[in-house]
């Protein structure tokens, strides 16, 4: 089976009244996404629920949604996450004799060694296929804290530390967590990492890079955790300078390579896997780089296509 999983930082979604919900719904449906992980969700997902109820469901798609509590401090950096999935494809795990116990998504703030590390702890969901295949998807939604732009060095070090905890602690623990039915588990982390994958052609003012491959061992077995998606995903500021850390090309409207996917090819052996940024500004907004950041987001979505 093939699945398309999207990640989309919607930039203060639920807090900004100017969001074009029709256009956001058009993007989600037009890209045929089976699951979408959202970052920067405010108001306990009120805007996301409205998107589901008024702009997606009436188009004959069946979707479900879960929104996290807002985490962070109360000084404007507190935000939540959300998941939206096609209920024709996936469902939440159930247990109990009557299937009356459901594994609900949760904020990961109670794992040993991770408490207090994340400014905004990741949001974790398990999904089972509705038809075919004895497996489950385990998805980790994260928005690494950007930090105070006045203190670039410490802010970047914090981002890199949060990323290190994601790939060295959170991902392996979630990936190896046993559940009663012993389904094959396929685990993917995704979101806005606020860090770029290092490439020689990327000129990054602040050196906000991540390590693309992390190696770890369990007993005699060795594993890799790989972070993917090299395309630029954040839009330049209107004057193409602003506070972006990437050196934008004069011909480019994009600034940073911040949105990624992370998985282990050994423990999540997909038959096929690929990912890319979606050029939604050109495809859905007529190339209008003034309209898009004002009404949609300062990020474009990314998608990972997997075959199991």
Task: For every predicted segment, state its role.
Residues 98-105, 143-147, 276-285:
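Short, solvent-exposed aromatic-acidic interface loops
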Residues 1-81, 113, 164, 256, ...:
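N-terminal, active-site-proximal structural segment of metallo-dependent hydrolase catalytic domains
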Residues 19-24, 30-31, 36, 120-233:
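Extracytoplasmic, non-cytosolic globular domains
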Residues 42-136:
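Structured beta-strand-rich core segments of catalytic domains in phosphoester-bond hydrolases
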Residues 44-45, 172-188, 194-308:
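Metal-dependent phosphoester-hydrolase catalytic domains
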Residues 8-11, 38-42, 66-72, 84-87, ...:
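Active-site-proximal beta-strand/loop segments in catalytic clefts of secreted hydrolases
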Residues 13-22, 29, 39, 44, ...:
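Extracytoplasmic low-complexity repetitive segments enriched in small/polar residues
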Residues 2-15, 96-97, 136-146:
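Active-site-proximal beta-strand elements of phosphoester/diester hydrolases
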């Amino acid at each position: 089976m093939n699945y398309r999983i999207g990640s989309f930082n919607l930039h203060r979604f639920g807090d900004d009244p100017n969001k074009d919900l029709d256009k956001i719904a058009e993007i989600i449906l037009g890209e045929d996404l089976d699951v979408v992980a959202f970052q920067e969700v405010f108001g306990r997902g009120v805007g996301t629920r409205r998107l589901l109820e008024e702009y997606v469901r009436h188009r004959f798609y069946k979707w479900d949604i879960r929104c996290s509590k807002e985490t962070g401090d109360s000084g404007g950096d507190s935000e939540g996450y959300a998941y939206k999935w096609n209920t024709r494809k996936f469902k939440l795990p159930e247990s109990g004799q009557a299937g009356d116990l459901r594994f609900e998504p949760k904020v990961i703030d109670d794992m040993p060694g991770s408490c207090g590390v994340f400014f905004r702890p990741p949001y974790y969901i398990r999904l089972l296929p509705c038809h075919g295949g004895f497996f489950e998807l385990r998805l980790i939604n994260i928005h690494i804290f950007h930090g105070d732009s006045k203190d670039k060095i410490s802010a970047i070090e914090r981002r890199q530390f949060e990323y290190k905890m994601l790939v060295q602690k959170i991902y392996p623990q979630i990936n190896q967590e046993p559940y009663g039915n012993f389904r094959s588990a396929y685990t993917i982390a995704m979101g806005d990492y606020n860090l770029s994958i290092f490439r020689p052609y990327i000129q990054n003012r602040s050196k906000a890079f991540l390590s693309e491959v992390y190696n770890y061992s369990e007993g005699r077995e060795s594993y890799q955790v790989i972070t993917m998606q090299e395309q630029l995903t954040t839009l330049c500021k209107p004057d193409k300078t602003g506070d972006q850390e990437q050196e934008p090309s004069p011909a480019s409207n994009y600034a940073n390579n911040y949105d990624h996917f992370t998985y282990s090819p050994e423990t999540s052996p997909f038959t096929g896997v690929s990912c890319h940024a979606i050029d939604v500004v050109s495809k859905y907004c007529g190339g209008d780089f003034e309209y898009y950041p004002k009404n949609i987001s300062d990020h474009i979505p990314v998608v990972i296509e997997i075959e199991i």
